[in-house]
Amino acid sequence: MGDSNSSQEAYSDTTSTNASRIADQNQLNLNVDLEKNQTVRKSGSLEALQNAKIHVPKHSDGSPLDYPKLNTYTFVPTTVPPYVLEAQFDKLRLQDKGTVDGNVTDDKNLPKEFKWGQFASTIGCHSAYTRDQNYNPSHKSYDGYSLSSSTSSKNAALREILGDMCSEWGGEERLEGVLHSEIGANLEFNTTEERKEWLQYIEKVKDFYYGDNKKNPESPESVHNKVYKSDWVNELNKEREKWRRLKQRKLQQWRPPLTSLLLDNQYLILGLRIFTGILSCISLALAIKIFQNSRSNNTISESKIGQQPSTIMAICVNAVAIAYIIYIAHDEFAGKPVGLRNPLSKLKLILLDLLFIIFSSANLALAFNTRFDKEWVCTSIRRSNGSTYGYPKIPRICRKQEALSAFLFVALFMWVITFSISIVRVVEKVSSITNRN
């Protein structure tokens, strides 16, 4: 009992001593302020206050209260430990991010007089903190990583997907391309191992672009997984390059047969000539039929209709073209190959195709002009008095004229294709002979 009484007396003496020191410090500050005011009144300006020497008395015991500019708040113990403030700060930061850590201390554990708003502004710069406590060391490694490798890999992936933000996103095409794997539709797998690797690659692409990633990007597990993201993206790019090379290899396998078909196959050029001859025969028949209908008296106009240039030119050009097609088809299929004959004579013969291309183009232009001629039977214009300008409209002749224009257009296209392939064949043979010599 004696010891307890003595400790209580010592505690009361210490408390009274501290209270007296605080009162003395307040009185000291008041005296200093009064002396400053008197100095300003005597001099009449604030500049004299800077040069004036203010006498500040000191306590004799050398306590912190001897220094008037020392903040006494530093020596008052805080009621909330610093680690509680750090935990509450982490909880507030995670709430802003959309996630809450279960290990964060709840508000119920705090004292009633604790107000979060008063301490939130002092976290990290409180006078009771040391220099090493101004940041949370538990997140040091995560923050350092997020500013270096994870951010760079994430930005690289976003730049690859969203290269141009001004262009269209094309999400439907991307989804169709991944889910239906159009690249794999044209691939032929030699072994089951290649098919298995292709399916694994497709699954990785689906998981990368369309996976259900609902984890918190700021959580420790998510940050730890980001370490492998860069390597995983590199592996995915390697597999993508592998399948791109496989597709290129498949295309290279089809290229030699296609080249041989265009340059060496005699049946290809023969088929093109026959098809062009059929179109020329049909065009010639339509032109002759239009010519006959125009010369005969009809019940609508009760007179003969004047002939148009397209009809006469179609008859002349197609009649000569049929004879030329028969001759050159026989020469190319049954004659000597280009390598065993004079290339110049063969080239002169093929250049006649260019002559028919020119006349067919002119004939096509005249056919369209005849179809929309206001003074012919396909377009009739009525005057205000009810009479027609030019010939009345005759549907049966107009239908034949439209068909003639269509067949002339297709025939012109076939002339151009046949001429191009023939020229390429002659040039390729001549260049190969020159290289051998």
Curated annotation (Swiss-Prot):
Query: Which UniProt keywords are listed?
Result: Glycoprotein, Lipid degradation, Lipid metabolism, Membrane, Phosphoprotein, Transmembrane, Transmembrane helix
UniProt region (Disordered), positions on chain: 1-24
GO CC terms, sorted: cell periphery; fungal-type vacuole; membrane
For the Extracellular compartment, the record's topological domain ranges are 289-308, 370-403
Name assigned to this protein: Regulator of phospholipase D SRF1
Q: Which cysteines in this chain are paired by disulphide bridges?
A: none
* Ranges per topology, Cytoplasmic: 1-267, 330-348, 425-437
| UniProt topology in membrane | Multi-pass membrane protein
Q: Which residues cross the membrane?
A: 268-288, 309-329, 349-369, 404-424
Can you state the subunit structure given in the record?
Interacts with SPO14.
Its BP terms in the Gene Ontology are: lipid catabolic process
Lineage, top ranks: Eukaryota, Fungi, Dikarya, Ascomycota, Saccharomycotina
Ion transport as UniProt keyword: no
Q: Which parts of the sequence carry Phosphoserine?
A: S45, S167
**Induction of the gene:** During S phase of cell cycle.
Q: Which gene encodes it?
A: SRF1
Natural source organism: Saccharomyces cerevisiae (strain ATCC 204508 / S288c)
Where is this chain's protein located in or outside the cell?
Membrane
Q: What does this protein do?
A: Regulator of phospholipase D (SPO14) which is required for SPO14 catalytic activity in mitotic cells. Essential to buffer the toxic effects of C16:0 platelet activating factor.
Q: What is its main location?
A: membrane
Q: Which residues are glycosylated?
A: N297, N385
Keyword Membrane part of the UniProt annotation: yes
